[in-house]
Design a protein with these regions (language model features):
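Outer-membrane beta-barrel porins/channels
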Residues: 1-192
């Protein structure tokens, strides 16, 4: 059994902005370069995350594992220290748009002599307060121990469903996006 906590990450950021304009025309090129550099210092913090995991090992035959992760994405924030209206509005948008979300993972491995059979499942809740997005998937794999090396094969399938509004005004009906992502992985490990 395991419990973990990932603390928020605090960043001290500096944005640097320089602008210039180049205009090309038949009679030549004009460049306006005021040589002004704008520096913008601010702080950004990310959310924390809690994880709970449980695994059961049955002899040398295999294991079953479970993990649940939870994070409150409303805790992401920007700060400049003097009540900047732009950052205050951005923080309000984060709090009204994002929410807490969890991720559930199950997995297992079973050994038959030198052959390892593996399977897993993942289900992620959406972090967007207004959508009913769906992220779920499964994986299957096998590995064979040749003694001096191990060959692993795995297949994973992720199903992602989400809604996106193309425009802020007018045609605001969201479009539905369905993504089926399939990956095949082959790896070989050599024992030294």
């Amino acid at each position: 059994m395991g419990i973990s906590y990932q603390s928020p990450i605090w960043f001290n950021m500096t944005d640097e902005l320089q602008q210039y304009i180049i205009t090309k025309k038949n009679s030549g090129t004009d460049t306006i370069e005021p040589n002004i550099v704008n520096l913008y210092d601010y702080k950004m913090s990310t959310n924390s995350m809690y994880s709970v995991g449980l695994a059961y090992i049955f002899g040398n035959k295999g294991l079953i594992s479970f993990q649940y992760d939870h994070a409150n994405y409303q805790k992401n924030s920007f700060d400049i220290g003097n009540g900047d209206v732009n950052f205050m509005n951005q923080n309000k948008k984060i709090q009204s748009t994002l929410k807490s979300a969890g991720t559930l993972k199950f997995g297992g491995e079973y050994r038959i002599n030198r052959l390892n059979l593996r399977a897993g499942y993942i289900n992620q809740q959406t972090i967007n307060r207004t959508s009913k997005d769906l992220n779920k998937g499964f994986s299957f794999g096998l590995g064979y121990d040749f003694g001096g090396s191990i060959l692993n094969l795995a297949l994973s399938k992720m199903e992602i469903q989400r809604s996106e509004s193309m425009y802020q005004e007018g045609l605001v009906d969201p479009i539905k996006i369905n993504i089926d992502q399939i990956q095949f992985l082959v790896s070989c490990s050599i024992k030294l």
